[in-house]
């Protein structure tokens, strides 16, 4: 059924309203023990201050927070009284709301149509972001060590690039291991998924599990793993019989790197990775351009000086190449497209960038643990609301107007309308729908993605058909 824009936004509004009505929040606060008797500061007031009206719950003064609460709801609180309300039950309340939201059906109708969707039901992007917290919280949130931080929070996120649906999520200490979380995510895999993983999540065991479950993967290869290829030139005795020798030989990656030109791609056919545990896979090598090489060297120097991490001599020698392993069929993703497909992973970096630059999730004063956690989960709820709205608008603009939405621009514009959305939720579904229609009109006018330097966008790589503006309107097919 081809619904109108208003009809689709009304269905989206109904799902949102179902989770965030004032009466539901107050009822939930009683069920979770945040409120034990009738009080002026209940679940809706806590949600108001942490989600809707203050994005600096951890850094603004308590006096300022009381002022913002009074301006939004008319509730009068003392700074001491408000600080007491930031307790363990408040954290549990906000954490529960966030958990229900990201597991909800908000993004079920936000998937876009693309050429890749014919082969990959979901494109799963997994990564983590980390930020420092007050040192006195090191017992609860130990950092990653080294000279980088003594206390920190790491947030792990895996989401579907087609729909924006959050698939796996974790808030934990900065020292948490990425690879362990990556393994835990395997239980949510479905046949036909495509997992794109970076080096922090690399595991031969996990990749083998994906292959056995009918799941595709594209991953960077850690350089401490050896690549073997089928012996291309067996040696013979004079009588023509083959000399006894290994069927596979070790690949000299440094030699291979030096034979490639910048920007060139090469595939090692009939290869496997690992000495003890063998993973038979396509191995694709991409030689970085000079610009990419300089960026990598700059990043390595920063990492060594700021985070206390030392790269091995082998890693430094092989800085000029990316080595990818994948089980995607060559006919669907040829070697020339592997690097582009892997670059889809960088979309999650844009999402994490908004968390800090727009939502200030990493900003705090020297405060107690419960208030910091209320800030984090309040920001995560606001982030999810803006993110899910953005993905819905992206789907509508593509389906109805054949346009590509800029994720970063859109999330900023949606955030600007959060307080209007808060006011609408206090009323009814129709009021929420009106705000979303206003947002759609704004994003249609000002939210188009810029096409700079002829770089491929997400839609280009995924094979989405859409219109873009040059000197004249054209239809772009990746």
UniProtKB/Swiss-Prot annotation:
NCBIfam families: transpos_IS4_1 (NF033592). This is Transposase for insertion sequence element IS231D. Pfam families: DDE_Tnp_1. The keyword Nucleotidyltransferase does not apply. GO terms for biological process: DNA transposition. InterPro entries: RNaseH-like_sf, Transpos_IS4, Transposase_11. Keywords: DNA recombination, DNA-binding, Transposable element, Transposition. The keyword DNA-binding applies. It comes from the Bacteria. GO terms for molecular function: DNA binding; transposase activity. Belongs to the transposase 11 family. Involved in the transposition of the insertion sequence.
């Amino acid at each position: 059924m081809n619904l109108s824009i208003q009809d689709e936004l009304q269905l989206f509004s109904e799902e949102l309203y179902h989770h965030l009505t004032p009466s539901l929040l107050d009822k939930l606060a009683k069920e979770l023990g945040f409120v034990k008797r009738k009080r002026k500061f209940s679940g809706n007031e806590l949600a108001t201050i942490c989600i809707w009206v203050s994005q600096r719950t951890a850094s603004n003064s308590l006096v300022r927070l009381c002022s913002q609460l009074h301006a939004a709801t008319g509730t009068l609180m003392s700074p001491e009284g408000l600080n007491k309300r930031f307790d363990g039950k408040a954290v549990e309340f906000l954490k529960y709301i966030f958990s229900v939201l990201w597991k909800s059906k908000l993004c079920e109708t936000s998937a876009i149509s693309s050429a890749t969707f014919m082969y990959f039901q979901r494109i799963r992007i997994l990564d983590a972001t980390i930020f420092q917290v007050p040192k006195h919280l090191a017992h609860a949130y130990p950092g990653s060590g080294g000279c980088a931080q003594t206390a920190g929070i790491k947030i792990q996120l895996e989401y579907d690039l087609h729909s924006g649906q959050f698939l796996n999520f974790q808030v934990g200490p900065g020292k948490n291991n990425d690879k362990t979380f990556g393994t835990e995510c395997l239980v949510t895999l479905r046949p036909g998924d495509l997992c794109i993983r970076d080096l922090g999540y690399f595991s031969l065991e996990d990749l083998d599990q994906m292959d056995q479950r009918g799941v595709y993967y594209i991953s960077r290869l850690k350089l401490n793993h050896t690549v073997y290829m089928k012996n291309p030139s067996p040696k013979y005795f004079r009588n023509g019989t083959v000399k006894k020798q290994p069927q596979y030989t070790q690949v000299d990656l440094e030699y291979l790197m030096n034979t490639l030109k910048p920007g060139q791609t090469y595939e090692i056919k009939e290869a496997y990775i690992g000495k003890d545990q063998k993973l038979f896979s396509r191995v694709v090598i991409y030689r970085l351009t000079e610009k990419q090489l300089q960026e990598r060297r700059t990043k390595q120097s920063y990492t060594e000086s700021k985070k206390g991490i030392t790269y091995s001599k082998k890693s430094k020698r092989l800085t000029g190449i990316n080595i990818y392993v994948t089980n995607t069929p060559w006919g669907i993703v040829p070697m020339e497209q592997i690097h582009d497909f892997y670059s889809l992973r960088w979309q999650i970096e844009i999402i994490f960038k908004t968390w800090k630059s727009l939502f200030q999730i990493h900003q705090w004063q020297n405060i107690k643990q419960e208030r910091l956690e209320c800030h984090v989960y309040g920001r995560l709820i606001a982030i999810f609301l803006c993110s899910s709205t953005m993905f819905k608008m992206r789907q509508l603009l593509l389906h109805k107007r054949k346009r590509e939405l800029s994720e970063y621009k859109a999330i900023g514009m949606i955030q600007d309308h959060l307080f209007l959305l808060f006011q609408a939720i206090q009323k009814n579904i129709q009021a929420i729908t009106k705000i979303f229609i206003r947002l759609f009109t704004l994003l249609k006018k000002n939210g188009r993605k810029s096409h700079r330097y002829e770089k491929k966008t997400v839609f280009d790589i995924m094979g989405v058909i859409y219109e873009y503006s040059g000197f004249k309107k054209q239809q772009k097919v990746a």
